C-alpha cells in the first residue's frame, strides 16, 4: 500500500513539474539524454549535504535588494562595471534550487526577485544597469544576457506570460542594438566581442519559448557576424571555423575561457532549434580541444582566467589558476554535450570537476567560494569585486555548477532511465510505457567502492536501465540480482530486461590507487582513487626529514589504507594512508581528498597534489604557490562575515 502511494505521488510530481514548464514546440532536435524532471531527484550523503548547504547558506540568504539596486540606478559606465551579471547568475542557480527542492521560501524569493527586476525596465524594455549613452559598452550586453537567462528561468518555473513578455522586450532591445544594419556584435564590449556574443544562448531560448521567428533569425545573425570583419578583427571571430579546425583554445580570437565556452553553450541551443550539424560539431570539437590542451587532473585549468595550454603546465606554479567561473561553465558545457550526444565521457568529466575542482572551491560554510583554485598552496577565499553588492562572479557561479548535478545524475534515454552518478540518491523516473519507476542508490560512493541500485515499480515492465561505467574504472563488477553482467569502461552498460519491484543492481568500482605521471614528463606523480584526486595536507602529514618514493604493486597501483580518524580530524570527506618508501623503509603518508585539502582557507593550511619523485619531505610544502598567486586582491581576504 505504501509503495502504491509513492508511485502515484511520483507520477503526480512529474506531471506537475511538466505542467509548470512551458512546452518547447520549436526544437528541431530532441536530446538523446533528457534531464530528470524538476524535483524528481533527491541526493543524500556528503554531496547532498553540500547541495543543501549551498541552497540554505548562499542562494536563499542573499540580500536581493543589493542585486536589484544597480538595475534601478543605472549608473554603470566602464569596463570595470559588471554588477549587471550578478542578479542573473544568482537567480539561475536559485531557480534550479527551487526546482530541486521547492519550498514556499524559495518560491517567494524567486517571485519577488523577478518582479522587482522587471520593474526596473527602461521604457523600451531594456533591463540593465546603464543609461542609454553607455549601452553596448563594457560588460553591458553580457549583463543583459544574464538578466534574460534569469527571467527565462523564472518563466520556465511558472509559465507566467507577463514574465515572458518582459523577456521578449529585452530580446527586442538586443535586436535593435545588434540586428542587421546595426552595430556588429563583435565590436561590442570586452575581449573582441566574446562576452557580448554569448547572448546567443538566451536569444535561442527565447525563440524556443515564443516560437517567434525573429529571435531565431537574430541568433543566426549573431553567428554570421562571427565570420565578418570587425573593427578589432580583420577576419572576424571565426569561433566555429577555429573549433572545427582543432585550433588550441589559447589561439582563438580571444582566449578568455569562461566567455568563449558561453558562446558555445549558445551554439548547443542553436543546434537544438535548427538541427544544423555544425552548431553541434563546433562545441564537440572545442570540448575535445580543451580536453587535449587545457584540462588538469582536478578539472578545467586556466591561468588568469584565460586558456594557456594548461595541461602540460599544471604541475608547476600557475598564476591565478582554475577560475571557479571557468569550472562551472566547463561543467555546463559538458552537461549540454551529454544531453545532445549521449556520450558518457561528458558525464565522466562532470564527475571529475564536481568532486575535485568545484567542491574544492566551496568554503565549509557554504556561502562563499574561492576565485582561483590551485593544485598546491593554500585555499584563498574570493575577494569582493563590488562592495556595494558584496559578492564576486565566482561566488555566484559556483552554485550554478553545483545545482546542475541533479539534472545529470539521472536522465532518460531512448529506452529507459540512465544513471550517471552513484552518490546515495533517490530518483523518481518514468518508464517508456509511462509507469513510475523509483531508483534508490545506496552506499557511500565514492568513499565506498560499490553502490547498490534498488528498483521499484508497480507492474513488471520490459525496458532498459543504463549505467555509466566510468572510464577510470578498469575493473568494474556489475550484477543484477546476483548475476554478473560484462561491462566495458567508458561506456554505458544498457541492461534490457523485464524489471520488477525489488530488483537489485550492484556495481563495484576499481578504487585502487592510480598513479598519474606529470603530462610534461617532469617526474612528478599524483595519486587518484576513483574520481577523486588525493592531496597531502600539512595538518595530516607534517614536513620532516626524509626522501619518499611512492610504493606500487606489480600493476603500478599504490596501496591505500582508509583512515577515517584522519578525515575526521580535518573534517575531510575521506583520508587514506598511502605506502611510500622513505629512506629505503616502508612508511605511510596520509592523504585526503583534494576538495578538502586546505579547507581551513588559511595561510597556514598548505596542501600539495603533484609530488616530485623522490619527494623531499622536509620541503614538501615549499611549493612556491603563494596566496598572492591565487588572488586578484593585494591583501589576504577572509570569508566575509554574515
Residue ranges and their predicted role:
Residues 219, 283, 348-356, 361-451, ...:
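C-terminal beta-rich recognition modules with glycine/proline-rich loops and embedded aromatic residues
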